[in-house]
């Protein structure tokens, strides 16, 4: 994917950059794999805001993605590489030999006409899916399962990848994008390769309006609020009241650990930095 700069004909366009999308196919999305997507605006079932800074944005339809890759030993051909408004990565439409169609996350190097396969006999090439037990050490992977059969959960965003470091008994040791080293059952599946659309992080939106098109609302600082809205609100001038940075509910932030202990902690070999 290339990045295109626009002429600075206005303040909003001065730093704008766009993706060129030359690797995408000029086709309509597969209708059988589309679902209506209703927006919540960050509200829960009772109508209260539980996730701030969400709302608005362009109307979308959800693309059903095959994260489980459970159609084994049936070859599939890549019919198209498409844009997905619901994620930073691109998606690939697969047509299986038996006629079924499915979307998967498109890795780097996958192009229209390529053949992909799921199973123990699959080659180590981008787009193929195998169990960790069948992969050589050092393999770069994405869409990795945490529990066998649950579907890929790790490394699904644009440009992300995981490296298979070691195998010990019933578990494999992975190096995650956060630099965390974690053990995962060796029977879990993963897809070979790095997630595509690597230049996504280099895009500059250029203006607040493009952020709103994505469904993201303004992020207001606590010190800019009134005392009734935030512990750091109010005061004369830019004062924080003398307390350390915290959330609207008084929980310390900026480095404060909030992760609760859980049984799966024993699977973490080395915590992220």
Curated annotation (Swiss-Prot):
Q: Could you tell me the keywords of this UniProt record?
A: Ribonucleoprotein, Ribosomal protein, RNA-binding, rRNA-binding
Coiled-coil segments? none
Q: Which GO terms describe its biological process?
A: cytoplasmic translation
Single GO molecular-function term? rRNA binding
SUPFAM superfamilies per UniProt: Nucleic acid-binding proteins (SSF50249), Translation proteins SH3-like domain (SSF50104)
Per UniProt, the ranges with Basic and acidic residues bias are 264-273
**InterPro entries attached to this UniProt entry:** NA-bd_OB-fold, Rib_uL2_dom2, Ribosomal_uL2, Ribosomal_uL2_bac/org-type, Ribosomal_uL2_C, Ribosomal_uL2_CS, Ribosomal_uL2_dom3, Ribosomal_uL2_RNA-bd_dom
Organism domain of life: Bacteria
A single cellular component GO annotation? large ribosomal subunit
Ranges where the record places region Disordered = 222-273
The record's section on NCBIfam families has: rplB_bact
Task: Give the protein's function.
Answer: One of the primary rRNA binding proteins. Required for association of the 30S and 50S subunits to form the 70S ribosome, for tRNA binding and peptide bond formation. It has been suggested to have peptidyltransferase activity; this is somewhat controversial. Makes several contacts with the 16S rRNA in the 70S ribosome.
Homology family: Belongs to the universal ribosomal protein uL2 family.
Subunit organization = Part of the 50S ribosomal subunit. Forms a bridge to the 30S subunit in the 70S ribosome.
Protein name per UniProt: Large ribosomal subunit protein uL2
> Gene name?
rplB
